[in-house]
């Protein structure tokens, strides 16, 4: 039974949001420099790059860089269109996380609840010719706030006294 979200199901949710967005053809995760753009032939591509986690009272913020990119013709004649389409995809993803009802689907029988949130303004930055092949797109840092009760009763640790 999962009452609170964690890193694994947050990544899985982001991957599913990418898969649900009909323009995105490929979703990848991990360090952006490990992505093999030559082998990923289906574009537009969404890449999820974990940045860090911030522990707070009763919650944790997981920060991710989200890259949305597409191929640009060698003469760059479609670069403006690629940037426009990729920005629209970014807007869709951010809107879903801020307002989307798809995150409110939960399995009440299993004790699950919709516990993903994002807060504040999100800056979306364009990039062109950033990687080895001709891709352009946008990147933004996405803070995902998840509930976390820091329950030490279920932590896999000895319960003997540790202080001196």
Kindly give the residue locations of the regions a language model identified.
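Charged, amphipathic alpha-helical segments and their flanking helix caps
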Residues: 1-28, 49-164
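Short acidic low-complexity segments
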Residues: 29-39
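A short, hydrophobic beta-strand-centered structural micro-motif
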Residues: 39-51
């Amino acid at each position: 039974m999962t009452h609170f979200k964690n890193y694994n199901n947050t990544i899985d949710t982001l991957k599913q949001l990418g898969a649900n967005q009909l323009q995105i053809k490929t979703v990848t995760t991990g360090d952006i420099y490990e992505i093999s753009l030559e082998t990923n032939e289906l574009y537009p591509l969404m890449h999820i790059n974990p940045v860090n986690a911030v522990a707070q009272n009763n919650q944790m913020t997981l920060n991710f860089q989200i890259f949305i990119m597409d191929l640009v013709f060698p003469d760059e004649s479609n670069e403006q269109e690629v940037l426009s389409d990729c920005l629209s995809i970014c807007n869709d993803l951010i809107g879903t996380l801020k307002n989307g009802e798809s995150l409110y689907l939960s399995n009440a029988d299993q004790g699950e609840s919709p516990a993903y949130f994002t807060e504040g303004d999100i800056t979306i930055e364009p990039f062109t010719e950033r990687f080895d092949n001709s891709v352009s797109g946008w990147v933004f840092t996405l803070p995902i706030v998840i509930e976390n009760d820091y329950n030490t009763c279920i932590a896999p640790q000895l319960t003997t006294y540790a202080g001196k």
